[in-house]
């Protein structure tokens, strides 16, 4: 049993340290912006409700991609597998040409960019935008779900500033 060492004021650094110890699944979120497709890597995606299907995520308002993304009416949340580490890194790199030759994607009939080979892609309609601090929390209703052909791929997770593959060896029970 770990004995608490005491309470500390919730500084920004201590808060970030706490969440570095908390693993999170990785997603790439894409939308059609006014100047073309936009996208970013996110570790904040979570399910909110199964009926109706709703998810939520947060993005930094300082990001130009996030600014265009949160103004869209619809978007696609791609839940990534470990074999898509390169895509996660590409969409996390500021100033990268995310929709150039490195990413295999195509526009859906509704206009949003869909990344090929994502294990899961959830097309969503934004329901709510909530500004909090330097971030925007988005709640979105899932309109359709596309399951990729590689549904048995290990998920990509982020923990302590590094990407990891979650596999059978990590199963505890």
Where are these regions (language model features)?
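Basic, polyanion-binding surface patches
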Residues: 1-173
């Amino acid at each position: 049993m770990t004995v608490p060492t005491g309470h500390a004021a919730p500084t920004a650094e201590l808060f970030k340290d706490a969440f570095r110890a908390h693993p999170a699944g990785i997603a790439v979120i894409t939308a059609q912006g006014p100047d073309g497709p936009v996208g970013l890597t996110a570790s904040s995606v979570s399910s909110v409700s199964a009926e109706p299907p709703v998810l939520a995520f947060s993005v930094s308002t300082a990001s130009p991609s996030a600014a265009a993304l949160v103004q869209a009416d619809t978007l696609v949340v791609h839940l990534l597998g470990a074999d898509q580490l390169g895509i996660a890194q590409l969409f996390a790199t500021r100033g990268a040409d995310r929709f150039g030759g490195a990413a295999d994607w195509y526009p859906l009939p509704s206009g949003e960019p869909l990344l090929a080979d994502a294990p899961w892609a959830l097309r969503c309609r934004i329901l709510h935008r909530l500004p909090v601090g330097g971030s925007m929390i988005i709640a979105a209703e899932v309109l359709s779900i596309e399951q990729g052909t590689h549904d048995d791929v290990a998920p990509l997770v982020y923990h302590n500033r590094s990407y990891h593959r979650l596999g059978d060896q990590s199963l505890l029970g």
